[in-house]
Amino acid sequence: MRMKKSALTLAVLSSLFSGYSLAAPAENNTSQANLDFTGKVTASLCQVDTSNLSQTIDLGELSTSALKATGKGPAKSFAVNLINCDTTLNSIKYTIAGNNNTGSDTKYLVPASNDTSASGVGVYIQDNNAQAVEIGTEKTVPVVSNGGLALSDQSIPLQAYIGTTTGNPDTNGGVTAGTVTASAVMTIRSAGTP
């Protein structure tokens, strides 16, 4: 009986170790990928389309002489698209906050300042009706609906342009040539229901 137990124990141990030695080479034939998932659960009735989470709007080149004449450059259109909107929506509220703006700078986005930056200019934002969007001030837009129900996909159309900080033609030579780089965060604060 003792011999049978020893033989059985030896057989079990041999099979365990042989399985381990056979499994080890398989580990050398595999590779791994680490997967990190991110997301956010919100109480908002719309979400920003992931393709619009980060945008670069190229405002082009503008001469100092054009700013002397008109005080602003041509407007460039862009949009922030929203998805998964609740059908009971009747308006969307948003705020644009400038990353370099202080409390008194509400007419335009203040550009970053460095050795190659233009001076005397800002980046102005307006809606698609050319109405000014003040920095840090909540703005309300109606939703697009069909049959009294808001569409699932909505869009906030906007325009941006480079202009003098006074908003007028640069008659005193306050504008200098250089790069203009401004950044902002647009927050969809809430979406109203009827």
From Swiss-Prot:
Signal peptide feature range: 1-23
A GO cellular-component term linked to this record: pilus
A biological process term (GO) from this entry: cell adhesion involved in single-species biofilm formation
Pfam families listed in its UniProt record: Fimbrial
Similarity comment: family membership: Belongs to the fimbrial protein family.
Disulphide bridges: 46-85
Full protein name: Fimbrial protein 987P
Subcellular location: Fimbrium
Keywords: Disulfide bond, Fimbrium, Signal
Gene: fasA
